[in-house]
């Protein structure tokens, strides 16, 4: 098996009414935990790494791990560059084998965002690499980037249509009321806006900030056309919470084979639930 482009995964999801879960990874243990569940449930999966992830663990190491697990579990998977902002950075990682990238120019004015995304699309498509971009802007914290509520804004459907036409992007992350991180109260998702975007945009749509969003809300976005669901914060909280609890019960403990497994098992429960919410189980052959 191999590392593949998200384009093929998302096209199938769009055609068959489900979503592919995209889980953020941080180290070898998080990769292993996610893929253990995806293999067991035979779910397609996207492993997403932010620039901060690749500062912590080298791309070459992550790529080697993903390739090995793809063979071990006999399943294709996509390794995705999440929230990258530099063409040069993306170019280097694509040359190293990555076949899926998100270029995030959502903090720029529309025309500047288009220009940046188009430059990435032109390069990536020459390398059989799919490209995701974001229009509108989510609030919250992602990696080292923080966006306050005043700077966040929702995606305009007609601008989304024009953006996709001008850039040739393969998938579009839309801002419809979610945010990166956890919520102090139940998020207000603009389902009508999502439906209007789906009517005028034909590429797969992406939901960022899906951690802590009620399952029924996520399912509704999938019914309305979302085909990729990003999950990051919930994974980290589950892992860290379990490890903290283990140390509270085992204050003299020091063997990572024990406490890391506890964290991985807690993370696996989140992964299992998100696969069920996305409706992606049993969609790759054994």
Curated annotation (Swiss-Prot):
One of its GO terms (biological process) is D-tagatose 6-phosphate catabolic process. GO terms for cellular component: cytosol. It is an enzyme of class 4 (lyase). The active site is at residue 82. It comes from the Bacteria. Dihydroxyacetone phosphate binds at residues 181, 209-211, 230-233. The keyword Cytoplasm does not apply. One of its GO terms (molecular function) is tagatose-bisphosphate aldolase activity. Its EC number is 4.1.2.40. It catalyses: D-tagatofuranose 1,6-bisphosphate = D-glyceraldehyde 3-phosphate + dihydroxyacetone phosphate. Belongs to the class II fructose-bisphosphate aldolase family. TagBP aldolase KbaY subfamily. NCBIfam families: cbbA, PRK09195.1, PRK12737.1, PRK12738.1, tag_bisphos_ald. PANTHER family: D-TAGATOSE-1,6-BISPHOSPHATE ALDOLASE, D-TAGATOSE-1,6-BISPHOSPHATE ALDOLASE SUBUNIT GATY-RELATED. Homotetramer. Forms a complex with KbaZ. This is D-tagatose-1,6-bisphosphate aldolase subunit KbaY. It comes from Escherichia coli O7:K1 (strain IAI39 / ExPEC). The lineage of its organism: Bacteria, Pseudomonadati, Pseudomonadota, Gammaproteobacteria, Enterobacterales.
């Amino acid at each position: 098996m191999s590392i593949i482009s998200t384009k093929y995964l998302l096209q199938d999801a769009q055609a068959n009414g489900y979503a592919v879960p995209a889980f953020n990874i941080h180290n070898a243990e998080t990769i292993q935990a996610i893929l253990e569940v995806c293999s067991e449930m035979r779910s397609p999966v996207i492993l997403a790494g932010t620039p901060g992830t690749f500062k912590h663990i080298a791309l070459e190491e992550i790529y080697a791990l993903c390739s090995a697990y793809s063979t071990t579990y006999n399943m294709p998977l996509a390794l995705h560059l999440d929230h990258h902002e530099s063409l040069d950075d993306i170019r280097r990682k694509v040359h190293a084998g990555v076949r899926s990238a998100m270029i995030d120019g959502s903090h720029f004015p529309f025309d500047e965002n288009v220009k940046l995304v188009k430059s990435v699309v032109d390069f990536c498509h020459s390398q059989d690499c799919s490209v995701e971009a974001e229009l509108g802007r989510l609030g919250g914290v992602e990696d080292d980037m923080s966006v306050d509520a005043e700077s966040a804004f929702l995606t305009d459907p007609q601008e989304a249509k024009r953006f996709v036409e001008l850039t040739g992007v393969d998938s579009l992350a839309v801002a419809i009321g979610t945010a990166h991180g956890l919520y102090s109260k139940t998020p207000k998702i603009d389902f009508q806006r999502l439906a209007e975007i789906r009517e005028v945009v034909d590429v797969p749509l992406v939901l960022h900030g899906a951690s802590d969003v009620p399952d029924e809300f996520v399912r509704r976005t999938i019914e309305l056309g979302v085909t990729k669901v990003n999950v990051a914060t919930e994974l980290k909280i589950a892992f860290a919470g379990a490890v903290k609890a283990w140390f509270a019960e085992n204050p003299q403990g020091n063997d990572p084979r024990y406490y890391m497994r506890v964290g991985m098992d807690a993370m696996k429960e989140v992964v299992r639930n998100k696969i069920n919410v996305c409706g992606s189980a049993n969609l790759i052959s054994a």
